[in-house]
Amino acid sequence: MMNRREFCKKAMIVAGGLVIPLTALEVFNPRRLHAEKGGKSKVRWVFLVDIHKCVGCGFCVKACKIENEVAWDANVTRTWVERYVVTKDGQVNIDSPKGCRDGFTSQKIDQASVGLKEIKPEDIAKGFFVPKLCNHCDNPPCVQVCPVGATYQTQEGVVLVDRTWCIGCGYCVMGCPYGVRYFHPELHVAEKCTLCYHRLCKGMKTACVDACPFGARQVGNIRDPGDPVTKIITTQQVNVLKEEFGTKPQVFYLGLSMEVK
């Protein structure tokens, strides 16, 4: 028997003599409707990363995989850490072996299939680590391109994926300019960072924030002027990734270098 996902992929609607692919329509999703019509919340979750404090230990990645049951050995992760090594001649070298799940065990740059690249210490101008995750944008393109409403935004601004509605079309994966989405290796539906929404709803911090021993990651309510994260964002120089795309990302960075894309 054909399930709903298979039906949605193959279904065509005939109207007025025209054949219209179902992917051109918006399928009703009651959960998304509730998220859109629930009114403005007093909470808008945002994330803050302090580049100066990140040491690339990988504890955050481990914690995320365990908390959210992300396949341990599969080459997928909801959050990861990139290592940047900038040489004096201006070359930018970036790696993130296993998403930094095990930290950075070698001083050499992991170039995947190309192999390891050794950079002499005297040639290095600067080096730093950059944690990345879903930006839970105010204007999320992934929500806009999903043809069945499986990707939606909560009243608190968290972007989620409803596995039971996702048909695995991949539009959201291709539509995300941050490359934070992937296909679940077994369920074949879109997956991403949920900002540990299940924990936030219980008054807990995200798993990655709890796991970071140096306070490089923080989560807060931008609509609360007394929130420590809000105070930092409103009083210090912070940056976001790919601001030019107009997605209005809500992951803010302290100490973000111009080399980071």
What function would you assign to each model-found segment?
Residues M1-K261:
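Non-ligating segments of multi-cofactor redox enzymes
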